[in-house]
Amino acid sequence: RRHSFPTRRSSDLDGRAVYRPTCHYAYHPCNDAILSLHEINGSGILPENKHILTADEIVSGGDDLGVLLYGHAKGAMWYGSRLSIAEARALAPYQNATGMQVTSAVLAAMVWVAENPNMGFVEADEMDHVRCLAVQRPYLGQIEAHYTDWTPLSHRINRFASDQDDSDPWQFINFLAT
């Protein structure tokens, strides 16, 4: 009896699925996009019926996707990839840079699952990052690292009294979370 790979089924006669790996990706739009949604919702005006941004409407630009590593002796470092729309479309016509970078991680996870079918459920940091990055690399564009002197307190405008720790800018109390 054949079953879809890598689903694991019980050994009894009913053959029910006891393990079926899944991938999940969560994305949060940038602050300007969220602000735009709030403005539309709060305006009291009905939004247009529908507008889907087509691939042809994206004529230039790119995406910087990375992580800010902070709180160490050198302050903070942004590490990530920069992919232009032209580079993305050279890899896959009608695609965009953000989609290419993001789905490269999903592709890497799927390859890892296919190559490690008996590992069961694992956290992302338990996967072989070297192998995953090798799968992702063609879809990431330029990989860059940049140090910065930015801190959560650098450009803060305190219009109202707030708790903050001026002795260590990297304390959680200094971050504004919404």
Question: Where are the language model's segments positioned?
Answer:
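C-terminal catalytic/substrate-binding lobe primarily of soluble NAD(P)-dependent oxidoreductases
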Residues: R1-R2, R8-T178
